[in-house]
Amino acid sequence: MAAGETQLYAKVSNKLKSRSSPSLLEPLLAMGFPVHTALKALAATGRKTAEEALAWLHDHCNDPSLDDPIPQEYALFLCPTGPLLEKLQEFWRESKRQCAKNRAHEVFPHVTLCDFFTCEDQKVECLYEALKRAGDRLLGSFPTAVPLALHSSISYLGFFVSGSPADVIREFAMTFATEASLLAGTSVSRFWIFSQVPGHGPNLRLSNLTRASFVSHYILQKYCSVKPCTKQLHLTLAHKFYPHHQRTLEQLARAIPLGHSCQWTAALYSRDMRFVHYQTLRALFQYKPQNVDELTLSPGDYIFVDPTQQDEASEGWVIGISQRTGCRGFLPENYTDRASESDTWVKHRMYTFSLATDLNSRKDGEASSRCSGEFLPQTARSLSSLQALQATVARKSVLVVRHGERVDQIFGKAWLQQCSTPDGKYYRPDLNFPCSLPRRSRGIKDFENDPPLSSCGIFQSRIAGDALLDSGIRISSVFASPALRCVQTAKLILEELKLEKKIKIRVEPGIFEWTKWEAGKTTPTLMSLEELKEANFNIDTDYRPAFPLSALMPAESYQEYMDRCTASMVQIVNTCPQDTGVILIVSHGSTLDSCTRPLLGLPPRECGDFAQLVRKIPSLGMCFCEENKEEGKWELVNPPVKTLTHGANAAFNWRNWISGN
């Protein structure tokens, strides 16, 4: 082929040639797993590797539905990639930020080719072959450019695909549906339909749940019922939004440059058919069950919640089913956030239509690999363990930590009256009061709204610092709220890390508590940098904060608080551009949300939800964010240390134990 000549070629991520079903199934059978269970695990993980299926089986060892033949649902979508996808994702973010979430945000940008249908686990590879056959058949006529025309109504905004390109795409969908029906064949399938058993309710959550909550039906399938889309082909931008947002959404949509090059990919996805009408939650924090009927949570876990079955859940709790384990139980709602519907879908295979220019100029090996159906997403895993470790270590990270226990948390707002003499001197009325207080220029009264750590709070902070030392984490810089309890916590953590002399604490008023929650009509009087240095805190006096202390306004609005935290996080991250270690931020419980969401590219949550979430954050609660340079975003990951859990210790009066009383 002459240099510069353009040829249409296809790339299909098909495992039939290089990795047949037996090669994936045999290792699982050799370990003693039943055939139907192994096939279920392979289908649930997209039939990628036996290792992933094995991990799924281990996670689901206590899943009450593990042995039930519940098939996955599958759908075929035409998805944009490249520059056009980036612009569409930008629209997704901006429309959500400016106009709130709507139904379109539940799924990634796509054109539906075939609605969801079921397929038996042992016949999933038939769908892969159907996708390949349909793609190969329409390869020569597939449009090199798909024209998109903007359409808007009072509740819908999207791009329509029409004309001859739409006809070819419909033919592709019809061919896939026909091939899938032929290859899947005829079978008798046993389906399990979810139904509530009268008189039992959610009490069945941990005792043979599936047998109690699912009713089996036998259905004769003459073919795999795949229905190609017969409606106007469309790529939805917004759906079921508020009418007053229509104009803003249209302006954002018109800003999408449709001239960008795009590779269109036909992607086959699956989902769990039982949870189609459930809400999907994503765990933000780790949670260790306190009772047998509670779920274990790890950050990133997805939980399916049926809003109609929450009668027995206490306020602040929900009943859900973990996608990772299949187990059902209670979980604290404020440990989670709403996730998108498609976050739990599994991508199986894709057929990509691309324009390749000057293929002859490529190396032979490169060209052949792109045309031979290699599963390209797996190439990212080909790094050696050493390279992968180096890549992980090199990532910039932010660890946000709430301060330790405050004195006023235990002894109430009148704590200062309990530990001060009439002439203003401090004494220790209880062992949980600190041994001493630092000197303040205006005397002890300024501690009332800027309380110190309790003795237990000091102990908590040291435990956390010691655990961070054991984890091997490398702290490169430390930022703290100007509240005394936060600066104390930062100092104690650094002492346990043996870094108190090497790293100075940068005091950042921009991450101080939401001032609306502070007592009084003025902001509390906080210790100056000079007072902190006199009290033996290693303070960086050269640091110029994003928000000076004098700029803190009393009773600020929720939006003002969020804007303040966002601006502070921008400066904090940019202040350490060369550091690849961990940025430690010691602040208040509220900042675990207000300082991480800007990094994650998430808008502020509703004010009421924010207050509910913050109320449950314990002392030394942590959120850990890592920068993913490959994808150009930050991610919430497991904190480097475990949580600190302990119970209350009530006051004791020995006089109550005098004999006879």
From Swiss-Prot:
Highest expression of UBASH3A in tissues belonging to the immune system, including spleen, peripheral blood leukocytes, thymus and bone marrow. InterPro entries: His_Pase_superF_clade-1, His_PPase_superfam, Phosphatase_SH3-domain, SH3-like_dom_sf, SH3_domain, UBA, UBA-like_sf, UBASH3A_SH3. Keywords: Cytoplasm, Nucleus, SH3 domain. It comes from the Eukaryota. Residues 15-60 form the UBA domain. Residues 395-661 are annotated as: Phosphatase-like. One of its GO terms (cellular component) is nuclear speck. The keyword ATP-binding does not apply. GO terms for biological process: negative regulation of T cell receptor signaling pathway; regulation of cytokine production. Changing W317L: Abolishes binding to dynamin. Gene3D superfamilies: DNA helicase RuvA subunit, C-terminal domain (1.10.8.10), Phosphoglycerate mutase-like (3.40.50.1240), SH3 Domains (2.30.30.40). The keyword Cytoplasm applies. It is found in: Cytoplasm; Nucleus. Residues 276-341 form the SH3 domain. PANTHER family: UBIQUITIN-ASSOCIATED AND SH3 DOMAIN-CONTAINING BA-RELATED (PTHR16469), UBIQUITIN-ASSOCIATED AND SH3 DOMAIN-CONTAINING PROTEIN A (PTHR16469:SF7). Homodimer or homooligomer. Interacts with CBL. Part of a complex containing CBL and activated EGFR. Interacts with ubiquitin and with mono-ubiquitinated proteins. Interacts with dynamin. Interferes with CBL-mediated down-regulation and degradation of receptor-type tyrosine kinases. Promotes accumulation of activated target receptors, such as T-cell receptors, EGFR and PDGFRB, on the cell surface. Exhibits negligible protein tyrosine phosphatase activity at neutral pH. May act as a dominant-negative regulator of UBASH3B-dependent dephosphorylation. May inhibit dynamin-dependent endocytic pathways by functionally sequestering dynamin via its SH3 domain. This is Ubiquitin-associated and SH3 domain-containing protein A. The gene is UBASH3A.
